[in-house]
């Protein structure tokens, strides 16, 4: 298991890389988002990662409306993803995530699924050309369902899954982590950990919501998963990140 941190998009990326490395994390989940982590010197970032011997996973903007029914907006989103792939490729990053798009007025869930799959297909080909693996992150309905992810993986066999355990807890009778690992464990290549109280994506420190982390970790370990886990915890008090890491290590 490797434990990393998602850089806070409100803070300068350079400062985040230094803090993450100096506090002994294994990798940075490098998100490219405004205001603090959008425009930066790629060569400087690459040099820092190398000097700190810090590994990296690629995280993209979760709010891009790439299925919105206007060609100009879709093109802009596609251009953004091309930029992400280029930057991550320069940084030697091999895993890049993508979030489903929900911004489609008057579109049924079925049509949203179809439009997302079509976009994923294009981005996946671009990633493959750059020797990168694309992974889809679970979130809100209809992209909270293991069945929908089974369908996506069936249509795009070499795409992978980025499972956010916090997202799997939102508006569900039971956390869906077990269901995802039961049906798609061989497709899951990256995890996000943060806590919540079951209604919103709160990004709380571990143990501050209602997720049963000991049980979640038991499920994950039983599957044989031993890859990257990102702590996606947003708090001005960064000692909560360190405490969450210590709790994770203890529970693991």
Q: Where do the language-model regions lie?
A:
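Histidine-acidic metal/acid-base catalytic patches
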Residues: 1-2, 10-21, 146-163, 169-252
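N-terminal pre-domain/capping segments
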Residues: 1-85, 89, 160, 249-252
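Active-site acidic/histidine proton-transfer and metal-coordination neighborhood
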Residues: 67-160, 170
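Conserved radical SAM core fold
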Residues: 62-66, 102-105, 195-201
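Hydrophobic faces of well-ordered beta-strands that scaffold small-molecule active sites
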Residues: 2-7, 28-30, 56-61, 96-98, ...
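Acidic (Asp/Glu)-rich catalytic clusters
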Residues: 17-23, 39-58, 83-92, 124-129, ...
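Short acidic/polar alpha-helix capping motifs at helix-coil junctions
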Residues: 9-13, 48-49, 86-89, 110-117, ...
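Acidic-and-aromatic substrate-binding clefts and catalytic sites of carbohydrate-active enzymes
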Residues: 7-15, 30-44, 65-72, 104-108, ...
């Amino acid at each position: 298991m490797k434990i990393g941190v998602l850089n806070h998009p409100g803070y300068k990326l350079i400062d985040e890389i230094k803090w993450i490395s100096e506090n002994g994390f294994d990798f940075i989940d490098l998100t490219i988002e405004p205001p603090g982590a959008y425009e930066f010197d790629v060569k400087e970032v690459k040099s820092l990662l190398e000097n700190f011997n810090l590994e990296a996973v690629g995280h993209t903007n979760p709010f891009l409306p790439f299925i919105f029914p206007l060609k100009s907006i879709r093109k802009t989103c596609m251009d953004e993803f091309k930029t992400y792939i280029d930057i991550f490729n320069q940084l030697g990053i091999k895993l890049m995530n993508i979030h489903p798009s929900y911004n489609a007025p008057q579109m049924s869930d079925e049509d949203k699924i179809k439009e997302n799959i079509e976009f994923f297909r294009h981005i996946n080909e671009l990633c493959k050309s750059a020797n990168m693996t694309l992974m889809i992150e679970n979130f809100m309905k209809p992209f909270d369902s293991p069945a929908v992810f089974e369908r996506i993986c069936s249509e795009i066999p070499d795409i992978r899954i980025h499972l956010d355990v916090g997202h799997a807890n939102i508006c569900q009778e039971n956390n869906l982590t077990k269901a995802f690992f039961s049906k798609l464990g061989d497709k899951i290549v990256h995890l996000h950990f943060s806590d919540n109280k079951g209604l919103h994506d709160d990004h709380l420190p571990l143990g501050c919501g209602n997720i049963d982390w000991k049980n979640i970790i038991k499920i994950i370990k039983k599957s044989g998963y031993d890859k990257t886990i990102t702590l996606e915890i947003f708090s001005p008090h960064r000692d909560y990140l360190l405490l969450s890491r210590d709790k994770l290590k203890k529970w693991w």
